[in-house]
Design a protein with these regions (language model features):
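Short, basic, helix/turn surface patches
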Residues: 91-102, 151-157
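Residue-level "edge-of-site" marker
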Residues: 72, 101, 130
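Catalytic nucleophile loop
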Residues: 108
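A glycine/threonine-rich phosphate-anchoring loop and its flanking beta-alpha core
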Residues: 113-183
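Acidic-aromatic/histidine active-site loop/patch
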Residues: 105
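ATP/NTP phosphate-donor binding region
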Residues: 1-98
Length: 183
């Protein structure tokens, strides 16, 4: 059973879709906001091992042309903005291409910030896999990166085109991250 919530922000409005199995059918989840073209997936090593093949297979099977950047997991990754920009440049992304963030809040923040600022803004879709990202960071429109001087010192307000939440991803979440999301 699917639940759909609409975030009404005028021109920046978007839907949040919540349904078991969305990770296996992510292509159909993005189709309403991005019917065709290239999709650049930003994820981390842990999430990629769990869901990367499933998401890439869904995108390829639906005719999208996906690329992927896999980063180390953890908060320190939010300092990797230059690496994301270089990967986007190497992929020759244009303003018509979509960025898809697949992971927890760190990946959503970093990938969303890169989408907001690369070529002055690429469309992006959040696919959060942690409880905290599903209930908080993926739906607030705040994206940012860290500096050595502190967390989230550089950022933007940039709304996703959609948020796709598969509650089944919580089954692979370590207990401490589940507790973080409940707090």
């Amino acid at each position: 059973m699917e639940t759909k919530l609409h975030v009404n922000l005028g021109q920046n409005s978007y839907d949040i879709r919540i349904a078991p199995g969305l990770l296996a059918d992510v292509a159909q989840g993005i189709r309403p906001v991005y019917p065709e073209g290239r999709v650049f997936v930003v994820t981390d090593e842990h999430v990629d091992a769990l869901y990367g093949a499933k998401v890439m297979g869904s995108l390829e099977g639906a005719g999208y042309r996906p690329g992927k950047l896999v980063l180390p997991p953890g908060e320190k990754t939010k300092a990797y903005a230059t690496m994301v920009y270089r990967a986007m440049a190497d992929a020759k992304l244009t303003r018509k291409d979509l960025v898809l963030t697949l992971g927890g809040g760190v990946i959503g923040d970093l990938g969303g910030f890169a989408a907001a600022t690369y070529l002055r803004g690429l469309p992006f879709v959040q696919v959060p896999t942690s409880l905290l990202a599903q209930v908080d960071s993926s739906v607030g429109g705040k994206v940012g990166v860290d500096l050595p001087e502190g967390k989230n010192l550089v950022g933007a307000f940039y709304q996703p085109k959609a948020v796709l939440i598969d509650p089944e991803s919580l089954q692979t979440l370590p207990d401490r991250f589940f507790r973080d999301g409940m707090a």
